[in-house]
Amino acid sequence: DGLEDEWYEYVPESYDPSRPVPLVIGLHGGLMTGWGHAIYTSWTLVADREGFICLFPNAHEKRMWTVEGVFETFRQEDAPDLPIVLPPENMDDNHDIKMIQALIARMEEKYNIDKGRIFMQGMSMGNIMTGQFARNYGRILAGAAGSGGPCEPFNLYDESGKIKNKA
C-alpha cells in the first residue's frame, strides 16, 4: 500500500536456530514507539532470561494505531493536531493489522518460531490494537494480554448480545 513500516526485533544471545522458540509481540501506546515499548516493558530482559524472541512494531500513522471504536465520534476540529486515522470498514484493509500479520510471517521465515507460542501484549492504545487483533485474527496467537486502553463494550458484543469473535 506504499507505506513504510518500522519495527524492532530482539533476539537473545541464547537463541539456537535448531530449536523453536516463542515470539512475543509488544504493541506500544499512542504516540510512543516500538523501541520505547521495548525499554518501558523490559521484554528484552525477560527474553534473555526465558529464551524467546521479541518484535516491537511501530504504528504507521504518526505513532497512533488504527483502532476501532475509539475515534468514531471524534471531530478533527476539536483537536486539529491529533493524528487520528479511522479504521476501514473491512478489518482486512487495516494497514496496521496487515503489517502485524506480515511481520509475524517474516519472523517465522527468518527465525525458528514456534507457531503454537506466539503471544501479543499491548499497552494503552497498543492494548486496544491487541484486543482488536485477537478478536479478528486470534487463531494465530497462543495468548494476548494488555494494560490500560480499555475496549468499548460495543466492540465486544453485537446487537443481539453475542460476543464478537472472528478468530
Where in the sequence are the language-model features?
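Acidic (Asp/Glu)-rich catalytic clusters
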Residues: 161-162
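Catalytic His-Asp charge-relay segment
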Residues: 165-167
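Alpha/beta-hydrolase fold nucleophile elbow
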Residues: 112-124
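Acidic-histidine catalytic/liganding microenvironments
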Residues: 110, 137-138
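A domain-start/cap signature at the N-terminus of enzymes
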Residues: 1-23, 49, 88, 92-97, ...
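Structural detector of well-ordered beta-strand residues that form the stable sheet scaffold
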Residues: 55, 142-145
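Serine-hydrolase catalytic machinery in alpha/beta-hydrolase-like enzymes
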Residues: 3-8, 19-115
